[in-house]
Amino acid sequence: MQDPAPALYGLRQRFPSPGGKTMVREGFFGALRLEEYARRVVCPHERTLAGPKADRLKLLRATRANLSSVFLLYQDRANKLAAELAGGFEQPALAIATDASGIEHSLWRFEAPTLQKAAQDFLKGQAVVIADGHHRYETALAYAAECRAAAGSAGGVRDPPWTFALAYFANAYAPGTLLLPIHRVIRSGRVPKAAEWRTRLPGWHHEEVPLASMEGLPILLAEQLGPRRGLPAFAADDGSGTLQIFWRPARPGEISIRAIHAEVIGGVFGIGEDAVRQGAIDYPKDALDAAREVRAGQGVVALYLNPLSPEEVFSVTAAGEVLPQKSTFFLPKLPTGLLFRLLEGPSEPVG
């Protein structure tokens, strides 16, 4: 059903965290004005691949619609925008559904011009970071370039709908916006002995911690890595029943995941960018999945990592740089097909 008038759509997701606690994230959908990355208005945090973009471009040409959204993060430490939009979430929801993973999704339509203006005013001039949907965003840019070339100098609509994309906006600092780590499993090679670890990682502190059972791994990692968030820190697990914990002081302006890739994956294991592209590393999101891979002989060592902070993500993107492949993921994922946006007719921008 086509909306009769411009609106934002609020989404509340109630979900279980990895630790079992029930959490809530609120955000909203709107039309995002497309900007080239060089303008530093919409910022990527990772690189993309050509193949997925080619497939998405074919789909966009065929449907002339956004069938899924780009997931964007904005910065609002004081939660000011959420307070402005709270009235919209107090109305009866349009729909409520729970998916197979136990996430409850509730959808609202924000018709009030005051709510729409609050979002536009807050986001005006603020850079946003793509949390998920880099391929979708770059495909939208490519499609817009095609449409612009086809239109030529004929004029027409000032802001045609293909100059916007369907986007979901969430506050990076809200309690329900979870940035979680993606771990590494080194697929092959020889596992360093304790003395070799220390030799290859000068300046790093080291502890050996027994792992009594796999079931206790999440708690053990929280105890050992949690207090060292923001530092280059990791736990190495070769399946022997002992975790090797390493950390060192952070250097000014340093991003922890970059240090680990340079000094551990590159320095200890000798794995460069070419080997990474050829599949030398697997990327489990769950530490228990990484542990199972090692114990099943699908890898020689798992490297368990801390999550990145919003500050680390925004500092990298503000400099026009990107993080190593699969540095972080965001929970919960957005449902696909909840909203569609036609690339015909008027558009009302949010950011």
Over which residues does each language-model region extend?
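Surface-exposed, charge/polar-rich loops and edge strands
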Residues: 1-351
